[in-house]
Amino acid sequence: MVKNELLECLLREKEARHSNGVIYYYTQTKMAYNSNRFEGNRLSEDQVREIFLKNTILSSNNIPVDINDIIKTINHFNAFNYMLEIAEEPLTEKVIKKFHFLLNRGTICEYTKDRIEAYINNQNMESILSEYAINILLEKYNTLIKKSLHDLIEFYMQFEMIHPFKEGNGKVGRLILFKECLNSGIMPFIIMKDFRLYYKREINDYEKKKRYLNEICLLSQDQYRTICKYFQII
């Protein structure tokens, strides 16, 4: 089972803090790089690896490095670790808020309320409606006994449409997808930055062309499955 073998391997390697050539290192660096790229992070993949392995960074061709990009990369590593630890627990509003907090801790976004006022503490009508919508979505989702990849993608798309946070909804949603894949015995996946324009376009047109997003996720799933086989995880 994907749930048993892959999750156990990721947790084992996380505790051992393995680095090169193993699935935990691959997943951490690939997901942090690609998911942050969707949100405008400008660090290169080599720089992300350098941060993960050595907690250092070298500028590329004397190009200034945005400290916010570094913090967001480290935050993604920490949020991914938390996701692994609670992968088999039910998906709740508390978990979603914790993902968002970990991803944005110490960044400009955390302190600039006019740029990111999450529904966590905001009590205006928009935030109240968002919180209500999230709770309804979670209630409906958690009644499903056996979840399919289609169910997970459907949840993600509705989460994106509710857009509970002013910023970072995509990164939170992609962590949710990975967590729920592990929890449901489904092969997880990392959506690479190469799909960015195609992926973003289909996000905005999901009701008409949702089959295309499913194809992106299935292709990404096949790519991750190939990596797992290469590392002899499955």
Where are the regions a protein language model picked out?
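FIC/Doc superfamily catalytic core
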Residues: 1-167, 171-234
